[in-house]
């Protein structure tokens, strides 16, 4: 042990390049899909980080529509986080099998509150909550000129000439019915009982976002972060009840007894849920988490742009080596890893995937998009969004202190492992994802990789020094026009 103390040399993204290879594939034809687990297939290998300035329901919806996955952060109350998950699951459905409904005796105020909370434009009305026989429908059109919201729904709902369809109606058949009758919602009934709902918006979204990552019921995929704190059991329970697809046990040091015990407990309690555990940086840690029951291991100790773990605690492994070491172990188990942190350009994404990652987790590259929950600021005439590490003082005071095993400390005693800052505003997420995946596609074309599995197994690296890195970036020129996929 003593003799091997300095034996290991590690590499990160700026130390390596992929070697071009003979290719018979064009970038537009490569396959970017990845099967992370039995129940979680993504159409692009990108996951938005579970950080309080990166991912809430708005980001998670946008990520899933692009084919990726969003992790709802846990710096909020249990019920609030479950609501965020439910917003994602209800944002898009092929067929809504358990639609919201109200009864005629409830108030218009209650209908308005429900429709506003879940951003829906109408709700079916049933005779009672047990029999659920359809008796009407209430839409924004019915509420347009209502001034007294205390009146009962029965006084304003549409009751006559209701258009319905049987439960086995396909989306194609539903679209024709909706267009014929110029309506937006089609209740599905069996013997008069409400059994489902199809909306024109859901049909339009299927057409607009054909690459969306969905579950077996046609709903968008969503993940949520949990920790190892006192509220973890109830938090996990509420998230599962809300329909979460992936639970992420998110800690700064995944190779610890508390995390391993939590993995065993969560997997035993919810065996049907895809379970991610991390963060780690070694093969040994990866092995222990997989043996404890994790489906996926998240890799990265301190590489993030807002993380100070490596300088505060002096601990970490440069990210390319960490990914490769953990992926080498993951191959023995037939399971996946997520490369989390340190990614600055699209070229770093493909390096992470070629080194063994099945997907990457992004924070800083997405924090500036419209869909992130970070506050918008104007600084020196430019627009920015707030971005902070979950180990920053602000994030720890809000609830992420358990991630760094400081749950029992008073705020004045916190030892932060992250900073708070701002990142340039980038506009819509889909534009950023388009550029990032364009770079990945280009890299796969250069390496002759038809899909991500081939990239992982066949791509080769060359090491480079500081001169090679300098040569890789634009040099001997003053940049006068900013590129959408390069800033330095």
UniProtKB/Swiss-Prot annotation:
<keyword id="KW-0479">Metal-binding</keyword>
<feature type="binding site">
    <location>
        <position position="473"/>
    </location>
    <ligand>
        <name>K(+)</name>
    </ligand>
</feature>
<dbReference type="GO" id="GO:0006177">
    <property type="term" value="P:GMP biosynthetic process"/>
</dbReference>
<comment type="function">
    <text>Catalyzes the conversion of inosine 5'-phosphate (IMP) to xanthosine 5'-phosphate (XMP), the first committed and rate-limiting step in the de novo synthesis of guanine nucleotides, and therefore plays an important role in the regulation of cell growth.</text>
</comment>
<feature type="active site" description="Proton acceptor">
    <location>
        <position position="403"/>
    </location>
</feature>
<feature type="active site" description="Thioimidate intermediate">
    <location>
        <position position="307"/>
    </location>
</feature>
<keyword id="KW-0520">NAD</keyword>
<dbReference type="GO" id="GO:0003938">
    <property type="term" value="F:IMP dehydrogenase activity"/>
</dbReference>
<feature type="binding site">
    <location>
        <position position="305"/>
    </location>
    <ligand>
        <name>IMP</name>
    </ligand>
</feature>
<feature type="binding site" description="in other chain">
    <location>
        <position position="302"/>
    </location>
    <ligand>
        <name>K(+)</name>
    </ligand>
</feature>
<dbReference type="GO" id="GO:0006183">
    <property type="term" value="P:GTP biosynthetic process"/>
</dbReference>
<feature type="binding site">
    <location>
        <begin position="387"/>
        <end position="391"/>
    </location>
    <ligand>
        <name>IMP</name>
    </ligand>
</feature>
<keyword id="KW-0630">Potassium</keyword>
<feature type="binding site" description="in other chain">
    <location>
        <position position="304"/>
    </location>
    <ligand>
        <name>K(+)</name>
    </ligand>
</feature>
<feature type="domain" description="CBS 2">
    <location>
        <begin position="157"/>
        <end position="216"/>
    </location>
</feature>
<keyword id="KW-0658">Purine biosynthesis</keyword>
<dbReference type="Pfam" id="PF00478">
    <property type="entry name" value="IMPDH"/>
</dbReference>
<feature type="binding site">
    <location>
        <begin position="363"/>
        <end position="364"/>
    </location>
    <ligand>
        <name>IMP</name>
    </ligand>
</feature>
<keyword id="KW-0332">GMP biosynthesis</keyword>
<comment type="similarity">
    <text>Belongs to the IMPDH/GMPR family.</text>
</comment>
<keyword id="KW-0560">Oxidoreductase</keyword>
<dbReference type="InterPro" id="IPR013785">
    <property type="entry name" value="Aldolase_TIM"/>
</dbReference>
<dbReference type="GO" id="GO:0046872">
    <property type="term" value="F:metal ion binding"/>
</dbReference>
<keyword id="KW-0129">CBS domain</keyword>
<feature type="binding site">
    <location>
        <position position="472"/>
    </location>
    <ligand>
        <name>K(+)</name>
    </ligand>
</feature>
<dbReference type="InterPro" id="IPR015875">
    <property type="entry name" value="IMP_DH/GMP_Rdtase_CS"/>
</dbReference>
<comment type="subunit">
    <text>Homotetramer.</text>
</comment>
<dbReference type="GO" id="GO:0000166">
    <property type="term" value="F:nucleotide binding"/>
</dbReference>
<feature type="region of interest" description="Disordered">
    <location>
        <begin position="468"/>
        <end position="488"/>
    </location>
</feature>
<keyword id="KW-0677">Repeat</keyword>
<feature type="binding site">
    <location>
        <begin position="340"/>
        <end position="342"/>
    </location>
    <ligand>
        <name>IMP</name>
    </ligand>
</feature>
<dbReference type="Pfam" id="PF00571">
    <property type="entry name" value="CBS"/>
</dbReference>
<feature type="binding site">
    <location>
        <position position="250"/>
    </location>
    <ligand>
        <name>NAD(+)</name>
    </ligand>
</feature>
<dbReference type="InterPro" id="IPR005990">
    <property type="entry name" value="IMP_DH"/>
</dbReference>
<dbReference type="InterPro" id="IPR046342">
    <property type="entry name" value="CBS_dom_sf"/>
</dbReference>
<feature type="binding site">
    <location>
        <position position="471"/>
    </location>
    <ligand>
        <name>K(+)</name>
    </ligand>
</feature>
<dbReference type="InterPro" id="IPR000644">
    <property type="entry name" value="CBS_dom"/>
</dbReference>
<feature type="compositionally biased region" description="Polar residues">
    <location>
        <begin position="475"/>
        <end position="488"/>
    </location>
</feature>
<feature type="binding site">
    <location>
        <position position="417"/>
    </location>
    <ligand>
        <name>IMP</name>
    </ligand>
</feature>
<feature type="binding site">
    <location>
        <begin position="300"/>
        <end position="302"/>
    </location>
    <ligand>
        <name>NAD(+)</name>
    </ligand>
</feature>
<dbReference type="InterPro" id="IPR001093">
    <property type="entry name" value="IMP_DH_GMPRt"/>
</dbReference>
<protein>
    <recommendedName>
        <fullName>Inosine-5'-monophosphate dehydrogenase</fullName>
        <ecNumber>1.1.1.205</ecNumber>
    </recommendedName>
</protein>
